[in-house]
UniProtKB/Swiss-Prot annotation:
Membrane topology value: Multi-pass membrane protein
A single GO cellular-component term on record: plasma membrane
Keyword Transmembrane helix recorded: yes
Highest rank taxon of the organism: Bacteria
Keywords, comma-separated and alphabetical: Cell inner membrane, Cell membrane, Membrane, Transmembrane, Transmembrane helix
Protein name: UPF0761 membrane protein KPN78578_41360
Entry-linked NCBIfam families: PRK01637.1 (NF002457), yihY_not_rbn (TIGR00765)
Originating organism: Klebsiella pneumoniae subsp. pneumoniae (strain ATCC 700721 / MGH 78578)
PANTHER family for this protein: INNER MEMBRANE PROTEIN YHJD, UPF0761 MEMBRANE PROTEIN YIHY
Transmembrane segments: 44-64, 74-94, 104-124, 140-160, 183-203, 210-230, 244-264
Disulfide bonds: none
Amino acid sequence: MLKTVHQKLLHHTRPLLAWLKLLWRRIDEDHMTTLAGNLAYVSLLSLVPLIAVVFALFAAFPMFSEVSVQIRHFIFANFIPATGDVIQGYIEQFVANSSRMTAVGAFGLIVTSLLLMYSIDSALNTIWRSTRSRPKVYSFAVYWMILTLGPLLAGASLAISSYLLSLRWASDLDGVIDNLLRLFPLILSWAAFWLLYSIVPTTQVRNRDAVIGALVAALLFEAGKKAFALYITTFPSYQLIYGVISVVPILFVWVYWTWCIVLLGAEITVTLGEYRKLKTEETEQP
């Protein structure tokens, strides 16, 4: 009896262990942590210019003025744990100063923002080991569309949500709405990762693999956010070491951790497809 149970357990766990071994090998071969470090560095250079460009777009549309404030608070509350208020103050000061920049300065901000998108594109295609490249004009058009339409669509979505919540019938669903609002950051992260893993690679990605990889990345992101905030509030030793500039290493570590999660989700997505391909080849062999 015990021998039968043991054999069944081995039968079910052997594929999982083989897949985990393949995942670990790919992470090592792709130098995932090094890629995450590169993206973290570029992100820190591009973060403020990107936010400046996004909120400059909101400022160009008066209808989004109130929504932009809500989006700003949502981003800093849900995507930058514990130190969001301090970082928000610095970034808002920069955004206010950026409105007085010349055309050359504004062009520099846009180029820096596009640099981040290009780096993400390169890193993900490195993980997928895709040798195919898009035409430069097409890539620029996609980056520009994300940079311009992305914030506007997010603003329109939040505006519609606020309008629906203000309707009379919504008051009868307070409990349901509260639960949905708690899940909203997770759902948003899941959707964002799924789009990232589905659209950015220049090779075909199976939708189910992208959904699974995105879900794991979203769950790790939410768990990591809470764990990181708990560490910062419970063990504030970093403040004794860095003093008033402690927000800088905190932000860098968080951005690096975030990119590790994003790239791990990509590795999971691509490994699911590769493992399935290997199993198919083994089955077809005589």
